[in-house]
Amino acid sequence: MGYSAFMNGLDTTNGGLAAEPLIRLGVFAAVLALLVAWELLAPRRQPTVGRWRRWPGNVGVVVIDTVLVRILFPTAAVGLALVAEANGWGVLNVVAVPDLLAIFTAIVLLDLIIYAQHMLLHAVPLLWRLHRMHHADLEIDVTTGIRFHPVEILLSMVIKLGAVVVLGAPALGVMIFEVLLNATSMFNHSNVRLPVGVDRWLRRILVTPDMHRVHHSIVARETNSNFGFNLLWWDRLFGTYRDQPAAGHEAMTIGLPQFRDPSELRLDRMLIQPLRSNRTEGRK
């Protein structure tokens, strides 16, 4: 009954679909505020670059990303899920699956697709040129979790929309996944200190800040590990899991060998990074 009520509320004929971005925005703002406060009260690392240098570019690019997505994909993934359901598109709309199982399956499989996409962004040179802007941040905190090049965001959206149609993902499952992905991306990029026991317990299921920080190391073998954003299982299953950085969390260097100058943190410089030479990057 709860699922049916939600679906009726999202029905495009009564304008209920407009509530979905408001829900996402509310959760985004709440999680962002909580994590910023946590970073100030209990930081994991002492920043080597001031927030005043990094945050304007990081926040500026997410504003651009958001505007572009809303203009080019006005109904977003939840709206497409409703269209797919109405037309019987996708596996979960063809195979008789209980609602809750369909929602759970969609969330897990969408997370696997994000993991696979992330690996491709590192493995394919042209895609890496887009993704490396995310890794060029000289520190890692909650704003790094929303720092993605606009072209990468649009490409990710196309992949996500294709996955929603092929899977026949329920609208509620897509909405939950979108909210979780935004929240966990900010969480696992945040500069927060967790007790060792809590981190170890969370790592049974989720990607923690310490785990994902390894992925932002300047050391190539560490950069090419820990690709998960939400569920830990994929890194363990596919052999890409790395427990800790060799230099330790406090001493490790964040970022890439290229783009070390603080001027590269400006928004205009960030946006043209995919066009820049990678000869000095040293990833191989």
Stretches found by the model and what they are:
Residues 1-19:
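Short, strongly hydrophobic alpha-helical membrane anchors
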Residues 14-23, 93-98:
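Interfacial loop-to-helix junctions that mark the boundaries of transmembrane helices
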Residues 19-27, 50-63:
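Loop-to-helix transition at the N-terminal end of transmembrane alpha-helices
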Residues 249-284:
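A membrane-cytosol interface segment of integral membrane proteins
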